Amino acid sequence: MDPEVSLLLQCPPGGLPEKQVRAELSPAYDRRPLPGGDKAIIAIWESRLQAQPWLFNAPKFRLHSATLAPTGLPGPQLLLRLGLTSYQDFLGTNWASSAAWLRQQGATDWGDKQAYLADPLGVGAALATADDFLVFLRRSGQVAEAPGLVDVPGGHPEPQALCPGDSPLHKDLPGELVVHELFSSVLQEICDEVNVPPLTLSQPLLLGIACNETSAGRASAEFYVQCSLTSEQVRRHYMSGGPEAHESTGIIFVEKQSMQRLQETEMWPELCPSAKGAIFLYNRVQGSST
């Protein structure tokens, strides 16, 4: 494995389509208030805003836990238990200098080292071209997280896509629509970052959930998506610029058959943790079935 990443959940071989996943939203799955209150989170946010006035807060889904049903049973195979959190809470917990202490305290107080952490759920894609390459992006030096490192296309599912406003309520977010947002958000991120047309992309298959240990175990759902374009066609679309072109400075293609040994190459240390998680899951869930 790699100390920067851990695997929370691995889906069955080939991955899970949207209809095999369900979500349950509840305030019980939210972050616990910090010991001594949340004043520290607000103080961190205000100091970050002074340094980076372009930052904006937004609601996010919080992953509390995920459970796979025993194989062979009818109905959805994966249950996601989700709460709500925010970007502000992420910076004030997962990214705070006190994150390691918060994990220790959560384990002591609640038997859950993530209890006090925002843990906003991200999405990422192992995106394959028609000529059997996987797509990576070199992150811009301007992005807040992992500047200059190599990543897979990805981002976050957005509660505001289902319920406009800054303070969505759990009861206004039906599980079925949340699962659809999770799966459609990864396609939207690919279109925005790589600039390929939506109709060139297959329906995503969920590979599993990986945790970024450099941001206190923050989780990302990693997917496999097939593109009907060749690597050269994808490169041309990327070079013509998309809505989030500013987030990356270059596109990199690596042969699918190299994935099992990517950890032994000089590219591996350049990968950010979320990309490492996507590759580990791709190799275990999809790589063996292609």
UniProtKB/Swiss-Prot annotation:
Its cofactor is Mg(2+). Residues 118-285 form the Nudix hydrolase domain. Substrate binds at F56, Y87, R139, A144, D151, H156, E158, S274. It catalyses: UDP-sugar + H2O = UMP + alpha-D-aldose 1-phosphate. Its EC number is 3.6.1.45. A motif (Nudix box) lies at residues 175-196. It comes from the Eukaryota. Keywords: Hydrolase, Magnesium, Metal-binding. It is an enzyme of class 3 (hydrolase). One of its GO terms (molecular function) is GDP-mannose hydrolase activity. Mg(2+) binds at E189, E193. Belongs to the Nudix family. Hydrolyzes UDP-glucose to glucose 1-phosphate and UMP and UDP-galactose to galactose 1-phosphate and UMP. Preferred substrate is UDP-glucose. This is Uridine diphosphate glucose pyrophosphatase NUDT22. It comes from Bos taurus. The gene is NUDT22.
